[in-house]
Swiss-Prot record:
Its main location: cytoplasm. CDD domains: HisF (cd04731). One of its GO terms (cellular component) is cytoplasm. It is found in: Cytoplasm. GO terms for biological process: L-histidine biosynthetic process. Its EC number is 4.3.2.10. Keywords: Amino-acid biosynthesis, Cytoplasm, Histidine biosynthesis, Lyase. This is Imidazole glycerol phosphate synthase subunit HisF. HAMAP family: HisF. Heterodimer of HisH and HisF.
């Protein structure tokens, strides 16, 4: 059974990085180069972000080498925890990212094909370093239902796996991951709020921290996610396009009685 530890709710901006550049658009007026992940990470750090997540969306091996450089430079300038994910397939991948300066590594598709990978990673590096990223959606009408009604997806939510999302999160926790990054593919990009029902279901199934992702659109969306069981809230475009600041999100959560840093 999960019990709230009373820790501060973490606010986490997420940056998608392709060949060393931030993609999906960023609109920071005070930056010389809003496509530079190191500069953007430093700006979020200064603004009060509790952690940062980098998602490597590069497919090429040259892009992977570039990502390690980005992580190194970021770790030199930013002193909040950094999670890096995207294309992590092996224990060696985790080792390289941690050595480059990542504090945590998130694993997604590779673990679906080989769940024991999570146990191997947690054993070698410690549970606190390993995050299971779950891209989940409601099972489409006409597809075979899963027990919870949500399924794990791959390929940016386009391909269903038939694996129950809540059961998969619980299995990841049993295998030793230290955290679940729960991304609603239904809510992602809608700015209509987080999938609270899915958050509640996963929260009831695991004892490790859960990060809510997908759907943030205004300051009023964050406190309900915490009430539904999120230990941290992650967002991208609302921060990148300056629709919301870290401070505004924290103030809104604090006004609802949540502890923030």
């Amino acid at each position: 059974m999960y019990t709230d530890t009373g820790l501060a709710v973490r606010v986490i901006p997420c940056l998608d990085i392709d060949a060393g550049r931030v993609v999906k658009g960023v609109n920071f007026e005070n930056l010389r180069d809003a496509g530079d992940p190191v500069e953007l990470a430093a700006a979020y750090d200064a603004e009060g972000a509790d952690e940062l997540t980098f998602l490597d969306v590069t497919a090429s091996s040259s892009g992977r080498a570039t990502m390690l450089e980005v992580v190194r430079h970021t770790a030199e300038q930013v002193f909040i925890p950094l999670t890096v994910g995207g294309g992590v397939r092996t224990v060696a991948d985790v080792d390289l990212l941690l050595r480059a300066g990542a504090d945590k590594v998130s694993v997604n598709t590779a673990a679906i094909a080989r769940p024991d990978l999570l146990a191997d990673m947690a054993t070698q590096f410690g549970s606190q370093c390993i995050v299971l990223s779950v891209d989940a959606r409601k099972v489409p009408v006409g597809s075979s239902p899963t027990p919870s009604g949500w399924e794990v997806t791959t390929h940016g939510g386009r391909r269903g796996t038939g694996i129950d999302a809540v059961e998969w999160a619980a299995r990841g926790a049993d295998l030793g991951v230290g955290e679940i990054l729960l991304n609603s593919m239904d809510a992602d990009g809608t700015k209509a709020g987080f999938d609270l029902a899915m958050l509640r279901a996963v929260r009831a199934a695991v004892t490790v921290p859960v990060i809510a992702s997908g759907g943030a659109g205004n300051v009023d969306h964050f406190a309900p996610a915490v009430a539904a069981g999120a230990d941290a809230v992650l967002a991208a475009s609302v921060f990148h396009f300056r629709e919301l600041t870290i401070g505004q999100v924290k103030a809104a959560m604090a006004a609802e009685g949540n502890t923030v840093r």
